[in-house]
């Protein structure tokens, strides 16, 4: 696949979301000629953010609001001989998340383990000891699980080879996440607080593999981080870095099709007819949308990306989003808040498959960034980002009525997490339903967390980063291995870059696989304390 005469290869990246930006930095840093083609005028994809108010006085994030394991992001910059701190500033949060429960109690999760033990002591005298045991189990699991199951291409069933699996068997990956956590804590409040990220994998703690206990572990071990200026600023910083490395950006330029000739991706055709040639194409867009809309149907025949196969796949829930600009600041509350209602513990089929909207007492998440970073609002003002899980558009939901009901109910719901009197402080507001995600952001079925992470959609059974059927075509993002979430999206970009550097005769991607050590090794991590 190397270009004639050993010249620098040209890679087109479709989409300037976090996966595309990570791929652009990786590839430009290794000497590839990179062109990023993005339909929007600003970078970020779902991470681009939005502004509220006649003069844009409120700025809010629309996608990720949590950065885990910042060392992975640092390493993307470092391997390109750049410093992350020259482009963005990361802020560690003192409290990861305050989780409110159905019984009126709450738990503050934190990377400060002495304080975490004190928090858990409120739930029983044995909980601090249980935490120490669970963290020790996590330390043993983390290095093995991260490298063997996340920092790997998973391109064939060798992913499940006995030599690979043997070191993990003592962690009982066949257990559910609920059973694994309950085996230590024996309290549904603690178990569901630590297991709640499974919702964003398209699963329930009682159906999610215990392998994913690495997610709450790394949040307690490394903390949760915010990007100063919001995650939209991370998009801009990554774009600046890629440009500094020589990448070219074509913004406001939608792609009509990926061009395929004799089974090989040879470039893209832009809306309007312009043709761009390339040696390889990296697509960073919602996988099901991109396959159906950008890849010719005849090139997908017999693959796992046919329209029929994508219709049969299982997808995550969607979300109803409320974005508020407020004329007050809730400075006494943490950055991240979760309410777990009694319905979060439901295990009936309707609940497990996200069939209906819960309008009575839904669980929800709130981002209150002004307490950490006042840059998104005028002095004395702030923003809130409220997320309520809902079915995706594959379910028969009246979205107009759902929006009307939740617009009315959310201000009162917020009192359950200590946000009192929100209704009278709202100055600007915007709402997204599953249909917004589908129609405005090109997310198939509005399933914002992409393909569910069921056993039949994990590892080599999940769509590949390197497409098997079209040479030179790569997918990065939440729909491919290793899965949804900002951290794993960045790892999918690392996987794509590793393939491309090898195939260009440059050898493996430098410094990858990379498993951030449990002890701080960088200025950014060291600042977390």
UniProtKB/Swiss-Prot annotation:
Pathway: Carotenoid biosynthesis; lycopene biosynthesis. It catalyses: all-trans-zeta-carotene + 2 A = all-trans-lycopene + 2 AH2. It comes from Myxococcus xanthus. FAD binds at residues 12-45. GO terms for molecular function: oxidoreductase activity, acting on the CH-CH group of donors. Its EC number is 1.3.99.26. Keywords: Carotenoid biosynthesis, FAD, Flavoprotein, NAD, Oxidoreductase. Dehydrogenates carotenes in the trans conformation: converts all-trans-zeta-carotene into all-trans-lycopene, one of the last dehydrogenation steps of lycopene biosynthesis. It comes from the Bacteria. Belongs to the carotenoid/retinoid oxidoreductase family. This is All-trans-zeta-carotene desaturase. Its cofactor is FAD. Induction: By blue light.
């Amino acid at each position: 696949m190397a270009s004639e005469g050993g010249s620098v290869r040209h890679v087109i990246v479709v989409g300037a979301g976090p996966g595309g930006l990570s791929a652009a930095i990786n590839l430009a840093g290794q000497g590839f000629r990179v062109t990023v083609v993005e339909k929007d005028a600003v970078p970020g994809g779902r991470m681009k953010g939005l502004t509220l108010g006649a003069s844009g006085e409120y700025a809010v994030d629309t996608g990720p609001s949590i950065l885990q394991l910042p060392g992975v992001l640092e390493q993307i910059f470092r391997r390109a001989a750049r410093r992350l701190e020259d482009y963005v500033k990361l802020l560690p949060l003192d409290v990861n998340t305050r989780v409110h429960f159905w019984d009126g109690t709450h738990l503050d999760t934190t990377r400060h383990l002495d304080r975490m033990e004190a928090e858990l002591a409120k739930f029983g005298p044995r909980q601090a000891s249980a935490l120490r045991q669970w963290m020790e189990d996590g330390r043993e699991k983390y290095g093995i699980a991260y490298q063997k199951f996340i920092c790997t291409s998973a391109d064939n069933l060798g992913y499940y080879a006995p030599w690979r699996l043997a070191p993990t068997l003592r962690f009982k990956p066949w257990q559910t996440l609920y059973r694994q956590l309950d085996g230590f804590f024996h309290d549904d409040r603690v178990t569901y607080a630590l297991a709640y990220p499974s919702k964003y994998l398209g699963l329930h703690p009682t159906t999610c593999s215990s392998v994913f206990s690495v997610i709450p572990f790394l949040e307690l071990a490394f903390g949760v981080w915010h990007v100063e200026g919001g995650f939209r600023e991370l998009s801009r910083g990554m774009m600046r870095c890629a440009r500094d490395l020589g990448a070219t950006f074509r913004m406001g330029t939608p792609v009509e099709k990926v061009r395929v000739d004799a089974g090989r991706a040879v470039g893209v055709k832009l809306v309007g007819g312009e043709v761009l040639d390339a040696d390889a194409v990296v697509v960073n867009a919602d996988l099901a949308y991109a396959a159906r809309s950008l890849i010719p149907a005849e090139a997908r025949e017999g693959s796992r990306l046919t329209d029929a196969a994508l219709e049969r796949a299982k997808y995550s829930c969607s979300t109803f989003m409320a974005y508020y600009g407020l004329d007050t600041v809730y400075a006494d509350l943490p950055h991240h808040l979760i309410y777990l209602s009694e319905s979060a513990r439901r295990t009936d089929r309707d609940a497990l498959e996200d069939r209906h909207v819960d309008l009575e007492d839904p669980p929800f998440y709130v981002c209150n960034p002004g307490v950490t970073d006042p840059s998104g609002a005028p002095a004395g003002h702030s923003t809130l980002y409220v997320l309520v899980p809902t079915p995706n558009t594959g379910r028969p939901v009246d979205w107009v009525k759902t929006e009307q009901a939740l617009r009315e109910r959310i201000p009162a719901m917020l009192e359950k997490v200590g946000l009192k009197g929100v209704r009278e402080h709202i100055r600007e507001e915007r709402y997204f339903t599953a249909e917004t995600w589908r129609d405005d952001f090109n997310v198939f079925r509005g399933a914002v967390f992409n393909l569910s992470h069921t056993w039949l959609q994990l590892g080599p059974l999940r769509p590949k980063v390197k497409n098997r059927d079209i040479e030179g075509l790569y997918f990065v993002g939440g729909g491919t291995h290793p899965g949804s979430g900002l951290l794993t999206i960045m790892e999918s970009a690392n996987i794509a870059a590793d393939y491309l550097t090898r195939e260009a005769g440059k050898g493996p991607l430098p410094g990858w696989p990379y498993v951030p050590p449990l002890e701080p090794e960088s200025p950014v991590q060291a600042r977390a304390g």
